[in-house]
């Protein structure tokens, strides 16, 4: 099969790559649409992914084979599913989303009740998941958002409860990122907080408020942190959806002055990455790693993350809970820009993400 692999420090389309073998609980899909994520280029640039390993984490397609211990009552050949794959992993280098065939764990696979087709458009606005292009945008961002709210911040999976689950606001820095847009929708539907405060470009304000954001601060403003602190000095729940050294400093400064606060990071940044003079005893940094949901330890660069059964349980429960909400249109995919040359467009997609061409949208390649 064709696949996009890491070769000499680059993403390269290669032919004659073996189709991945199926482990227990996995299904094989004919991959029909894929989406890029920052972690894809990071696996190359930071030498996390092994040479020859298949890249890609977001895939949508049609089941062509059931692996061992897959109940045919739950998944059948011909079903349309979309799911997260740890592409270019040390443990399973022969499996990734950017390939003609991919293996997906049924534990965290989203299943469509209907056939998913190609829309054929160059640009896809946010909306219900009714197409392969839309489905490909979902797995990484929505599953990550679900983990942040349940595993890290302790929300219950209750749909539209009458009172907020937490007596305080949440701050989402990077509200227009893929994870940010998913978090806004979920925080709104789970009624998790008294307010949803987002930091994003003003151009995304209309969409983010439609999702449920209460107030937007523009990160372009030099005094954005001061603006936030002036209006809200009690933020105990904060998520850094951009997740770099600079945004960590800014998010950390927005945390409540006195009461305990948690900043959730999506990378390996810790308190050690916060400038010494800004560190505070009342602020804790927690992390969500989607790679931990596989149920096994994860070698990652020079670190090995231990198996995390609780993260796996949380992800499993979340996918089961949210799947029907996606199917009936209550959760939307984010905007997408579609590339029409299949796997051959993937290296370009990764470069476009790296240089920031994906503002407020996912970049999707269709394999038709």
UniProtKB/Swiss-Prot annotation:
Transmembrane segments: none annotated. InterPro entries: ADH-like_C, ADH-like_N, GroES-like_sf, NAD(P)-bd_dom_sf, PKS_ER, Trans-enoyl_RdTase-like. It comes from the Eukaryota. GO terms for molecular function: oxidoreductase activity, acting on NAD(P)H. GO terms for biological process: cellular response to acidic pH; response to copper ion. It holds the Pfam family ADH_N. Disulfide bonds: none annotated. Belongs to the YCR102c/YLR460c/YNL134c family. This is Uncharacterized protein YCR102C. The lineage of its organism: Eukaryota, Fungi, Dikarya, Ascomycota, Saccharomycotina.
